[in-house]
């Protein structure tokens, strides 16, 4: 065991008698004060099915730490349920919770001089929140994903929570009746686990597996299956070994690791939120990662997995087909993955993938062969233009034509937009603008799943565009562009668009444009005034004051001094 344990600051020497006295009260004995103290950041909560099974995993982590020769100390972290808060004022707290989680893990681990930490989370912001904390602290760390939910079933079809969101649009358009709507509601979420498609939670857990901060195959396991608990205990053993060998996050989270993550996110058809979160983690650790890197990688990596929201299958199907390691092996064989990247186990990516088959199983079509991809290029395009000089993120999977030019339909909030869609006031060819929903303007950069699902449900998914300085749920698909930067609140051009202006979204040319002269835009800009802050105190007020542009990951600790 290393002599440079951080916890020696509270366990060694006569001056630490009172410290040890308190530790004895929580279970330490004479032989435990030379062991590494390992934090268990427990995201258990009954707020959401994503996190409701995590307490059992945390107990398995404790057992694993003890068996490996460490002393666990468990503490809680918060979560917000994106699915439950979606479409409400509460959604403004979702992205904020990412930074609250990061702050809480950093505070507990550094405040208690812990030697390492195993973080266990489920809902979307749990993953990046934990990883930001790990990047800040740079102590041995591993992430355990709470696991994915199994699909619901109704009328012979697999359901996810997004099925319920889309059913609202179908119902308002008269396509389904009240009984069908209620049946979908009752069957969409059958138990514990995070939302089942390749939505944000499963995207980020997959990214962390690729980056080497979670164990192989762990990101696609079902929350309720025994292998998830077994993997948690194994993760604890791996972490204690990393403490002994001082394998640190900043040795793992290199430029190569981020490039690997982006490649796999493209290959599995992952969430737009991954762009924001990876930028934030890279920003924290000092890795030079920009929006342009996502576009470069997108152009060379095909979408190999036919997963919801735009595809047919859910994450448990991906697990059965070989999981993330199978996708990684295919990318490695085609020169699109850095095999020499280090992982928390001490092995390289290439070493971990050595025994993984070169090709996916023949009797499935969840993971396509290299010669028969779902799409020849990645699905997350970075657009720029006079509407987004810093950039914006477009999700172009599941759309027949990634180009549209049409009249702007301008809304100052998500609620106004949703009301218009459900009232049948949006027509084919329209380009919806939802603004003042950015990191500062919202604040909190709400996800627009309710409006986009209503568009899909109304049958307008291929004929209506939607642009916002807010975000999209991982469950969103269609011709949608989010993360527009600069945002409206800080004077971005999206705040100058007027009803009826001609707007162009062109994913092929990577263009996001309002077709108005520069002279006209300059005149509008001269007359524009920043709105009063929506919140001046409390968590949201503090967040709006500190948060950076989405093009930098919307972090809250950049350029503080």
Swiss-Prot record:
Keywords carried by this UniProt record: 2Fe-2S, Amino-acid biosynthesis, Branched-chain amino acid biosynthesis, Iron, Iron-sulfur, Lyase, Magnesium, Metal-binding
State which Enzyme Commission number(s) the record gives: 4.2.1.9
The entry's [2Fe-2S] cluster-binding residues are: 50, 123, 195
**Binding-site positions, Mg(2+):** 82, 124-125, 447
Q: Which residues form the active site?
A: 473 (proton acceptor)
Q: What class of enzyme is it?
A: lyase
Free-text cofactor note? Binds 1 [2Fe-2S] cluster per subunit. This cluster acts as a Lewis acid cofactor.
Q: What processes does the entry annotate via GO biological process terms?
A: isoleucine biosynthetic process; L-valine biosynthetic process
Name the catalysed reactions.
Answer: (2R)-2,3-dihydroxy-3-methylbutanoate = 3-methyl-2-oxobutanoate + H2O; (2R,3R)-2,3-dihydroxy-3-methylpentanoate = (S)-3-methyl-2-oxopentanoate + H2O
Question: Any idea which GO molecular function terms this record carries?
Answer: 2 iron, 2 sulfur cluster binding; dihydroxy-acid dehydratase activity; magnesium ion binding
Cofactor(s) listed in the protein's UniProt record: [2Fe-2S] cluster; Mg(2+)
Tell me the pathway. Answer: Amino-acid biosynthesis; L-isoleucine biosynthesis; L-isoleucine from 2-oxobutanoate: step 3/4; Amino-acid biosynthesis; L-valine biosynthesis; L-valine from pyruvate: step 3/4
Pfam families, sorted? ILV_EDD_C (PF24877), ILVD_EDD_N (PF00920)
N6-carboxylysine PTM positions: 125
Asked if Repeat is a keyword of the record, the answer is: no
Q: What Gene3D superfamilies does the annotation carry?
A: IlvD/EDD C-terminal domain-like
Assembly and partners are described as: Homodimer.
What NCBIfam families would the database entry show? ilvD (TIGR00110), PRK00911.1 (NF002068)
Q: Which family does it belong to?
A: Belongs to the IlvD/Edd family.
UniProt-listed HAMAP family: IlvD (MF_00012)
Q: Quote the function comment for this protein.
A: Functions in the biosynthesis of branched-chain amino acids. Catalyzes the dehydration of (2R,3R)-2,3-dihydroxy-3-methylpentanoate (2,3-dihydroxy-3-methylvalerate) into 2-oxo-3-methylpentanoate (2-oxo-3-methylvalerate) and of (2R)-2,3-dihydroxy-3-methylbutanoate (2,3-dihydroxyisovalerate) into 2-oxo-3-methylbutanoate (2-oxoisovalerate), the penultimate precursor to L-isoleucine and L-valine, respectively.
Name-wise, this protein is Dihydroxy-acid dehydratase
**Species whose genome carries this gene:** Crocosphaera subtropica (strain ATCC 51142 / BH68) (Cyanothece sp. (strain ATCC 51142))
What is the phylogenetic placement of the source species in the record? Answer: Bacteria, Bacillati, Cyanobacteriota, Cyanophyceae, Oscillatoriophycideae
């Amino acid at each position: 065991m290393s002599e440079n344990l951080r916890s020696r600051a509270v366990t060694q020497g006569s001056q630490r008698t009172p410290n040890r006295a308190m530790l004895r009260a929580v279970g330490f004995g004479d032989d435990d004060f030379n062991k590494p103290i390992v934090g268990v950041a427990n995201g258990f909560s009954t707020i959401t099915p994503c996190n409701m099974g995590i307490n059992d995993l945390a107990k398995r982590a404790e057992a694993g730490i003890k068996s490996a020769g460490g002393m666990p100390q468990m503490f809680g972290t918060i979560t917000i349920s994106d699915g439950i808060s979606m479409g409400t004022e509460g959604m403004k707290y979702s992205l904020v919770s990412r930074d609250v989680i990061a702050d809480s893990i950093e505070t507990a681990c550094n405040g208690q001089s812990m030697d390492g930490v195993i973080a266990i989370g489920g809902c979307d912001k749990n993953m990046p929140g934990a990883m930001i904390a790990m990047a800040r602290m740079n102590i041995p760390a591993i992430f355990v994903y709470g696991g994915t939910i199994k699909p619901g079933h109704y009328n012979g079809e697999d359901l996810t929570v997004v099925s319920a969101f889309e059913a609202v649009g179908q119902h308002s358009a008269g396509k389904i009746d009240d009984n069908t709507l209620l049946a979908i509601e009752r069957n969409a979420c059958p138990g514990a686990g995070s939302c089942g498609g390749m939505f944000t939670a499963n995207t980020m857990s997959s990214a962390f597996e690729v980056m080497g901060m979670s164990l192989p195959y762990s990101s696609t396991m079902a929350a309720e299956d025994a292998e998830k608990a077994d993997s948690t205990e194994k993760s604890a053993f791996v972490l204690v070994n990393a403490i002994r060998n001082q394998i640190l996050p900043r040795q793992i989270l290199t430029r190569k690791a981020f490039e690997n993550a982006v490649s796999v996110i493209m290959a599995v058809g992952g969430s737009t939120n991954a762009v924001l979160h990876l930028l934030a983690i890279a920003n924290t650790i000092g890795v030079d990662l920009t929006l342009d890197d996502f576009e470069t990688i997108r152009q060379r990596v095909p979408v190999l997995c036919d997963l919801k929201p735009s595809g047919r299958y859910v994450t448990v199907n991906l697990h059965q087909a070989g999981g993330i390691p199978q996708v990684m092996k295919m990318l490695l064989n085609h020169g699109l993955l850095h095999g020499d990247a280090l992982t928390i186990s001490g092995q390289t990516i290439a070493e971990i993938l050595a025994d993984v088959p070169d090709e996916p199983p023949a009797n499935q079509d969840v993971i396509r062969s290299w010669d028969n991809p779902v799409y020849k290029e990645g699905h997350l395009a970075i657009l720029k233009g006079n509407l987004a000089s810093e950039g914006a993120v477009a999700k172009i999977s599941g759309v027949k034509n990634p180009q549209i030019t049409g009249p702007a339909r301008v809304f100052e909030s998500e609620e106004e937009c949703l009301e218009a869609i459900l009232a049948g006031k949006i027509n084919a060819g329209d380009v919806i603008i939802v603004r003042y929903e950015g990191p500062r303007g919202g604040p909190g950069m709400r996800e627009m799943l309710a409006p986009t699902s209503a568009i899909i449900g109304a049958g307008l998914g291929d004929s209506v565009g939607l642009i916002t300085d807010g975000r999209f749920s991982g469950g969103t698909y269609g011709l949608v562009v989010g993360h527009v930067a600069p945002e409206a609140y800080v004077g971005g051009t999206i705040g100058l668009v007027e009803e009826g202006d001609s707007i162009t979204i062109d994913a092929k040319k990577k263009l996001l444009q309002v077709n108005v002269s520069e002279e006209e835009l300059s005149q509008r800009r001269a007359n524009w005034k920043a709105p009063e802050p929506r919140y001046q105190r409390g968590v949201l007020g503090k967040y709006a004051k500190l948060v950076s542009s989405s093009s930098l990951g919307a972090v809250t600790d950049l350029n503080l001094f």
